[in-house]
């Protein structure tokens, strides 16, 4: 039963919404490296934002991930969630970029929820290079998107820069899509 359906086993027998080591993606598929092992300053960093409208913790938070391609891998410098309304979000983004310690070349925003407005306002009020994400994945479900890149992640091609954000991130990965 455990191998036939990992989610059913976790839910019925373990009383948890997702398998402990992960469902769609597994924790062990991600490598964690110290920032001293990665040429941080030579990479082209991008901030990816999945925005939300509210501070209400019953809803999804806004997600912020700074990442870059490195050789054949993808490096995530940080990935955090915040419950922010639009005025706070507009202040947070430039501060988050400047405090990252790297040169963020491009900010990409999911064009849903607050995304379209966010791009327009940031363009008007700052010098941040910002754009809507334009891929076929924007119109797909979260599960479809996860499955589309699972082979890359399962192959150990995603590196997390060691930090306090790693454990909350890996927990979200493990409980996805049920957490």
What does each of the following model-derived ranges do?
Residues 38-39, 57, 151:
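Generic structural signal for beta-strand residues in well-ordered domains
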Residues 49-62:
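An active-site-proximal beta-strand-loop segment
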Residues 1-2, 57, 172-176:
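Short, Φ-rich (hydrophobic/aromatic) sequence segments
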Residues 16, 20, 24, 63-65, ...:
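Mg2+-dependent endonuclease catalytic cores in nucleic-acid-processing enzymes, primarily RNase H-like
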Residues 4-5, 56, 141:
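Generic detector of ordered secondary-structure context
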Residues 1-51:
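ATPase catalytic-site recognition across NTP-hydrolyzing enzymes
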């Amino acid at each position: 039963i455990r191998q036939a359906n990992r989610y059913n086993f976790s839910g019925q027998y373990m009383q948890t919404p997702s398998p402990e080591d992960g469902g769609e993606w597994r924790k062990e598929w991600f490598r964690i490296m110290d920032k001293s092992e990665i040429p941080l300053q030579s990479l082209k960093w991008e901030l990816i934002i999945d925005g939300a409208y509210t501070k209400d913790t019953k809803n999804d938070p806004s997600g912020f991930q700074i990442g870059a391609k490195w050789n054949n891998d993808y490096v995530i410098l940080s990935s955090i969630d915040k419950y922010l309304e639009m005025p706070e979000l507009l202040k947070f983004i430039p501060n988050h970029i400047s405090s990252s310690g790297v040169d963020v070349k491009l900010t990409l925003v999911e064009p849903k929820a607050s995304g379209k407005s966010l791009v327009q306002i940031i363009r008007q009020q700052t010098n941040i290079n910002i754009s809507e994400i334009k891929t076929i994945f924007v119109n797909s479900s979260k599960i479809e998107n996860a499955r589309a890149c699972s082979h890359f992640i399962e192959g150990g091609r995603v590196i997390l820069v060691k930090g306090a954000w790693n454990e909350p991130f890996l927990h979200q990965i493990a409980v996805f899509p049920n957490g």
